[in-house]
């Protein structure tokens, strides 16, 4: 972003680096932060804040980093998915990541084993994200049958988008429409 580069290494303790790249022949580490886990995908929130999606132990972790003081970046908020294990395609496919700062909206697909009353769950996880409130889980939208004995890959949510006040989630077999405010179902289309 601009004259700065943000990156992480993939270790058990995740150094989040802020690097000055104004002179490409002489990059310089301005600051770093060591925290548990790692961020496999970094996305700008604004000029002084970065969203990180990655892992902490065996679960998906979302971080909001404050880089306004480049010499001492901080993790100002984080959310770690509950359950025994979780994964997200965001770590290998940035197009599965939906973010709109003006709506405080963050949405992406997650697969979870051992989550609440479900032995397995897959769907779009919806979060609110802001500098004042941090990261908060709002709910999940799945295309799977309730309480499946096995998840069906054709019903894995792959993409999300919104138009006006409707959130659309898409899998190979279905498109669901939900109210953006309360996530209540509006309609669905089988493909």
Region roles according to the model:
Residues 1-191:
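Feature marking well-ordered beta-strand scaffolds used for ligand recognition
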């Amino acid at each position: 972003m601009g004259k700065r580069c943000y990156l992480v290494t993939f270790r058990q303790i995740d150094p989040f680096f802020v690097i000055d790249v104004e002179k490409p022949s002489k990059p310089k580490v301005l600051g770093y932060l060591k925290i548990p886990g790692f961020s496999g995908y970094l996305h700008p929130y604004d000029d002084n804040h970065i969203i990180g999606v990655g892992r902490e132990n065996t679960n998906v972790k979302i971080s909001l980093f404050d880089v306004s003081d480049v010499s001492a970046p901080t993790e100002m908020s984080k959310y770690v998915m509950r359950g025994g294990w979780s994964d997200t395609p965001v770590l290998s496919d940035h197009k599965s990541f939906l973010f709109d700062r003006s709506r405080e909206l963050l949405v992406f697909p997650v697969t979870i084993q051992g989550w609440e009353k479900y032995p397995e769950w897959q769907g779009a996880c919806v979060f609110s994200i802001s500098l004042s409130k941090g990261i908060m889980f709002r709910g999940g939208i799945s295309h799977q049958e309730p309480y499946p004995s096995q998840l069906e890959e054709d019903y894995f949510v792959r993409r999300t988008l919104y138009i006006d006040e409707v959130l659309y989630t898409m899998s190979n077999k279905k498109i669901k429409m939900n109210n953006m405010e309360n996530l209540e179902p509006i309609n669905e289309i089988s493909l």
